[in-house]
From Swiss-Prot:
Name the record gives this protein: 2,3-bisphosphoglycerate-dependent phosphoglycerate mutase
Name of the coding gene: gpmA
Alphabetical GO biological process terms: gluconeogenesis; glycolytic process
First-level EC class: isomerase
Organism whose genome encodes this protein: Bifidobacterium longum (strain NCC 2705)
Function in brief: Catalyzes the interconversion of 2-phosphoglycerate and 3-phosphoglycerate.
Family annotation (PROSITE patterns): PG_MUTASE (PS00175)
Length: 246
């Protein structure tokens, strides 16, 4: 028995375009991002990787990416489950800040520590900051972080994956997760059992489906999965890696 899981990062967002740390700030897709999401859905249809259920975050860039991709794949009718635990990593006080300016102000070492360290979060956000989520009604009753490292994201994604997503896979469904660079990196780390050093080098491109076929123990048959458009994925991952450079 093998299981099919598809990971899809949202298309380009407004703050991807302006090179800002986004985190939990609910920014929209750009026109390019919408086009990327449509192409992602077309790839699902072309490769006959048709999801039966989709999981997404509570942020519109992921929700809209899922909707656009599903529409393009003629799967807009399938069930959707949304949960904050699939949200992007919370970037704390960096949310809204320009990545290049942060790199210039604090230096390469600190910038990369905050951006790619597994266990070191950025500075915490002030609860009164315009980009804080303390009073956002969608998180009523849920813990709102003030900053997260990737380890924190794994801590929230892992139990959700095991309790909500694994049962759908075990039922034989093809599952699509439309989420964010870091919540998807958390899943990649879990599936491939990557070290902290290995996951630091993983960059997820926007809106290119990443297919994992899993064995009965939920281990990847092909390590790191397979992008449905490998050439575009390689170029997209390189662009993500270059964010914040001059």
């Amino acid at each position: 028995m093998t299981y099919k899981l598809v990971l899809l990062r949202h298309g380009q967002s407004a703050w991807n375009k302006t090179n800002q740390f986004t985190g939990w700030v609910d920014v929209p897709l750009t026109e390019q991002g919408e086009a990327e999401a449509k192409r992602g859905g077309e790839l699902l249809k072309e490769k006959n990787v048709l999801p039966d259920i989709v999981f997404t975050s509570l942020l519109r860039r992921a929700i809209n990416t899922a909707n656009i991709a599903l529409d393009a794949a003629d799967r807009l009718w399938i069930p959707v489950q949304r949960d904050w635990r699939l949200n992007e990593r919370h970037y704390g006080a960096l949310q809204g800040k320009n990545k290049t300016e942060i790199r210039e102000e604090y230096g390469d070492e600190k910038f990369m520590l905050w951006r790619r360290s597994y266990a070191t979060p950025p500075p915490e956000i002030d609860p009164n900051d315009q980009y804080a989520q303390n009073n956002d009604p969608r998180y009523a009753g849920d813990p709102v972080p003030e900053a997260e490292c990737l380890a924190n994201v794994v801590e929230r994604v892992k139990p959700y994956f095991e309790s909500a997503i694994e049962p759908e896979l075990k039922a034989g469904k093809t599952v699509l997760i439309a989420a964010h660079g870091n919540s998807l990196r958390a899943i990649v780390k879990m599936l491939d059992n990557l070290s902290e050093e290995e996951i630091a080098k993983v960059n997820i491109p926007t809106a290119i489906p990443l297919l994992y076929e899993l064995d009965e123990n939920f281990k990847p048959i092909k390590p790191r999965g397979e992008y449905l458009d490998p050439e575009a994925a390689a170029a997209g991952a390189a662009a993500v890696a270059a964010q914040g450079q001059k």
